[in-house]
Amino acid sequence: MTTREDILERLAYADALGHGPRTSALVAEAVSWADALGEEDLRVATRLALTEAYQQGNEEWKALEPFVWNLARYQRRPELFDDAQVRTLHWHFKRAVAVAAANPKVSKDKVRQLEASLEEF
C-alpha cells in the first residue's frame, strides 16, 4: 500500500525533475495515490502541485481540473489550506483566468465572471 511518505517522496522527485509532461505524469500519479489514501491535506497538496506542474509544463488547460477541485474544496473546507497554500491557490486562480481569456471558445462574459470571482477571492 502506498504511504504518505511515498506520496511526499514522489512530489519531491517530480519537483527535482523540472517542468514537462513527465513531471506532470508523476504528480498525477501522486494525486491518485493521495485519493486512495484519503488524507485530505495530501489530496489538496498533490492537486496544488499538479496545477503547478501543468501550468509550468506548458499544459495550462490541463491545470484547470485540479485547480477547480481545489477551489471547490477551499470554498467548502478552508481549514484544509494553510496560508501558503491559499496564496498558491490565488496565483493559480490568476493563471486560470488568463488561460480562459486566451481561449476564443470562452465568452467575454464568462471571463468577466471569472475575473469578478478572482476579485472576491
Predicted regions, residues:
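A ubiquitous short alpha-helical element
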Residues: A12-L17, A34-D35
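Internal alpha-helical scaffold/solenoid segments in large eukaryotic proteins
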Residues: S24-A34, L42-G57
